[in-house]
């Protein structure tokens, strides 16, 4: 039986993969258990870039050993227009750009009805990855996963519902380690994936990174944002989410990114933000909602900080003015004390 893990990515690359959906015979653990052995998961790195009303979610699936097949599930904010192989150096270049000072194929939309009420929107093969874009409710996606040989962890129904009520779109990725070995992929080799999604604002799933983990297990990830204006986001940087870079992207960086495969859409100017996730799975109950418009009003609902109308509680972001005041004050303090210091460090470089 396959093992299913859920990733960002980020995306982001928004990224990618750090949630473990374990086989029924195995308890949840920090590593991924494949059908023929153990596959270790590294730190997830994701880019969520936003330009012209389109999110470019880029993440990488990395082969780190083991055999058989395993998979991941990435919630998406909308229906992608394209799923293709990502560039060769985009994520690495971003990591280098934001290092601390002094430290050195597109698929066809098929619209095929699948069992359990899930609609298969796209199917794409990239190297040893089989990628499927699904549309359906949380329960339907769970049925689809089990019918395709995956075993779900006990917390999967709650987590899948958490996402499906906001956007019923998921990307299922199946990685065949045996096929990767046949292709000559070695330990540490990664397959970058670039997902193009029209959406009102960029969004990065974070809660999914704790899927299948014990509540006290550590979850770490790097999330890069590239936006045409200075972004605002929820939740504000604080416990478990740390702002490590916030400043205007340099012309050299943008030129380097633009030269990578599939990155010609890169804008002439952009604001670069790096957020680091460092949290226990039990505390990671939110996603990263971004307002890229410059108005400074990211969505509480997209961040998963308020319940949807059918689950009770506040019905929309506008109903929480007190929360907006608190977030504005906290965000301003965070950016003033952390972001500006990081910009100064970037200038010194």
Task: Walk through the language-model features, giving the residues of each.
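Accessory, solvent-exposed terminal regions and/or long lumenal/extracellular loops of proteins
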Residues: 27-44, 51-53, 79, 152-331, ...
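Surface-exposed, glycine/proline- and aromatic-rich loop segments on solvent-exposed faces
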Residues: 42, 49-98, 145-167
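Bacterial N-terminal signal peptides that target proteins for export
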Residues: 1-11
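Cytoplasmic C-terminal tails of single-pass
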Residues: 344-349
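Covalent nucleotidyltransferase core used to form phosphodiester bonds in nucleic acids
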Residues: 110-117, 121, 135-174
